[in-house]
């Protein structure tokens, strides 16, 4: 059971982590998946992959710097998403679901801890 997928697929305050850089990057990921859903092009996929890699790195550095206990679990989740992007089969619904549920379950665990 997961969280509802917003329609239209846009970031809203229910996804707020309260770290402005992370919230801004999450907005970018929502936009990237939204655009991929409207044009499943190599360029849109490459841009989503670039933004995702940057965001995951930034988030992981914050976790390492704060010695966040859930770091290893979080990195495994990130690695799984990157693997799916690197082996893309056009499943935008999966990507939408993954991001929504990742933020609201995995990311919400570090609120106030990094």
From Swiss-Prot:
GO terms for molecular function: iron ion binding; oxygen carrier activity. Fe cation 2 binds at residues 59, 74, 78, 102, 107. PROSITE patterns: HEMERYTHRINS (PS00550). Fe cation 1 binds at residues 26, 55, 59, 107. Keywords: Iron, Metal-binding, Oxygen transport, Transport. InterPro entries: Haemerythrin, Haemerythrin_Fe_BS, Hemerythrin, Hemerythrin-like, Hemerythrin-like_sf. It comes from the Eukaryota. Hemerythrin is a respiratory protein in blood cells of certain marine worms. The oxygen-binding site in each chain contains two iron atoms. PANTHER family: BACTERIOHEMERYTHRIN. Belongs to the hemerythrin family. This is Hemerythrin subunit 2. It comes from Golfingia vulgaris.
């Amino acid at each position: 059971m997961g969280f509802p997928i917003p329609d239209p697929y846009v970031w809203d305050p229910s996804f707020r982590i309260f770290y402005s850089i992370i919230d801004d990057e999450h907005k970018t990921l929502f936009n990237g998946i939204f655009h991929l859903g409207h044009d499943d092009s190599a360029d849109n996929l490459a841009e989503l992959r670039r933004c995702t890699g940057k965001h995951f790195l930034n988030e992981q550095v914050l976790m390492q710097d704060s010695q966040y206990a859930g770091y290893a679990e979080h990195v495994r989740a990130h690695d799984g998403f990157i693997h799916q992007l690197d082996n893309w089969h056009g499943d935008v619904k999966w990507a939408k679901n993954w991001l929504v549920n990742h933020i609201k379950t995995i990311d919400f665990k570090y609120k106030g801890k990094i």
